[in-house]
UniProtKB/Swiss-Prot annotation:
Quaternary assembly: G proteins are composed of 3 units, alpha, beta and gamma. The beta-gamma subunit complex (STE4-STE18 complex) interacts with PLP1 and PLP2.
Stated role: Implicated in the pheromone A- and alpha-factor response pathway. The beta and gamma chains of the putative yeast mating response pathway G protein play a positive role in initiation of the mating response.
GO cellular component, one term: G-protein beta/gamma-subunit complex
Family: Belongs to the G protein gamma family.
Descriptive protein name: Guanine nucleotide-binding protein subunit gamma
Gene behind the chain: STE18
GO biological process, alphabetically ordered: G protein-coupled receptor signaling pathway; pheromone-dependent signal transduction involved in conjugation with cellular fusion; regulation of pheromone-dependent signal transduction involved in conjugation with cellular fusion
Subcellular location: Membrane
UniProt propeptide residues: 108-110
Lipid-acceptor residues (S-palmitoyl cysteine): 106
Anything else known: Present with 5550 molecules/cell in log phase SD medium.
Species, as recorded: Saccharomyces cerevisiae (strain ATCC 204508 / S288c) (Baker's yeast)
Amino acid sequence: MTSVQNSPRLQQPQEQQQQQQQLSLKIKQLKLKRINELNNKLRKELSRERITASNACLTIINYTSNTKDYTLPELWGYPVAGSNHFIEGLKNAQKNSQMSNSNSVCCTLM
């Protein structure tokens, strides 16, 4: 009888040990999941196109030196009377979109 009485007591530590192992596995799975998510996030960030600060500055300088801004008449002069460069830019953009047959463009940025 003592062996029968001892068997439930032996089962409890075994069950507790199994529960501890299951809990340990769940924790390890969660850690692995978090590491994989972070790894994927870092891969996406690494695949993003990057330019150096000097190239970005050169692009800005090139744009500002080649694009006329009539809000600075001391630098660029005044626009020709009767001309509207906003409408001209819109017409050019529409012509370009018709030539390329691209209907995916919804807006024109100036």
